[in-house]
């Protein structure tokens, strides 16, 4: 009986994971495989290694405390430091424990909605948004990746406000920090002037109102480390 019960639980978890729509690239991601090791004898600086360990620890703490925890996670950092790895690891562990979740790529979501406007499409805007708005646990990957037009801001507002009002748990990843460091000037232009390019903040990409809303919805975890994919040459090993 115990064996049959365990098999049934595993089968259910597999079906729930299929519905979670985790991309094949990230199917291997779990906490055990999240490593701060580099190859070829390379090492992180103490600061970078501590940042990665702290991000892992906080994500694991979120999973351990769920559903008692009141806030989701906002994982902030440059490309290649493991934000998506940690987000998927959290989702997979919660699914294993019997919860329901959904992985959603920010840009792909917007493309699906735009495609629904085609008269020949069988889907609708609300049909695309409904599972994203109502999932028990949502991983929204690469927040702010699309240029913030009025339409984009309206869509992200619909999603985040709906989840906020219903107290649904959300894990987000983004490459955009709260504030950008003082930008370095580019070489001098003709005439001796220098042009300084300011990088966008998260508020620039999703709007000040939604950034404020995320303070209430999520605990911010900043991962300050170089791009893992550039630092490590191990074949087949990738982070996002």
List where the protein language model places each region.
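P-loop NTPase Walker A phosphate-binding motif
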Residues: 85-99
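Walker A/P-loop nucleotide-binding motif
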Residues: 69-87
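Pre-Walker A (pre-P-loop) alpha-helix and adjacent loop at the N terminus of AAA/AAA+ ATPase modules
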Residues: 36-73
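Loop/turn-to-beta-strand initiation segments
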Residues: 99-100, 134-137, 166-172
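Short glycine-rich substrate-engagement loop in P-loop NTPases that contacts/grips substrate
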Residues: 43-52, 95-134, 150
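Interdomain "pre-motor" coupling segment immediately N-terminal to P-loop NTPase/helicase cores
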Residues: 1-25
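Conserved Walker B
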Residues: 135, 142-144
């Amino acid at each position: 009986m115990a064996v049959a019960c365990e098999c049934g639980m595993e089968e259910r978890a597999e079906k729930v994971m299929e519905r979670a729509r985790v991309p094949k690239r990230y199917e291997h991601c779990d906490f055990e495989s999240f490593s701060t090791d580099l190859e070829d004898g390379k090492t992180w600086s103490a600061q970078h290694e501590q940042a990665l360990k702290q991000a892992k620890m906080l994500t694991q703490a979120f999973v351990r405390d769920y559903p008692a925890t009141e806030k989701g996670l906002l994982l902030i950092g440059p490309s290649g430091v493991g934000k998506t790895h940690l987000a998927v690891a959290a989702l997979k562990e919660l699914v294993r424990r019997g919860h329901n979740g959904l992985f959603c790529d920010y840009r792909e979501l917007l493309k699906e909605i735009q495609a629904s406007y085609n008269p020949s499409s069988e889907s609708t805007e609300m049909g695309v948004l409904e599972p994203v708005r109502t999932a028990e646990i949502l991983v929204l990957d690469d927040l702010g990746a699309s240029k913030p037009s009025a339409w984009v801001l309206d869509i992200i507002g619909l999603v985040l406000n709906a989840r906020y009002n219903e107290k649904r748990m959300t894990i987000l990843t983004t490459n955009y920090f709260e504030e950008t460091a003082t930008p370095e000037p580019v070489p001098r232009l003709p005439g001796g002037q220098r042009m300084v390019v300011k990088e966008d903040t998260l508020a620039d990409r999703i709007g000040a109102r939604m950034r404020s809303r995320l303070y209430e919805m999520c605990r911010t975890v900043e991962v300050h480390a170089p791009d893992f994919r550039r630092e490590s040459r191990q074949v087949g090993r990738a982070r996002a």
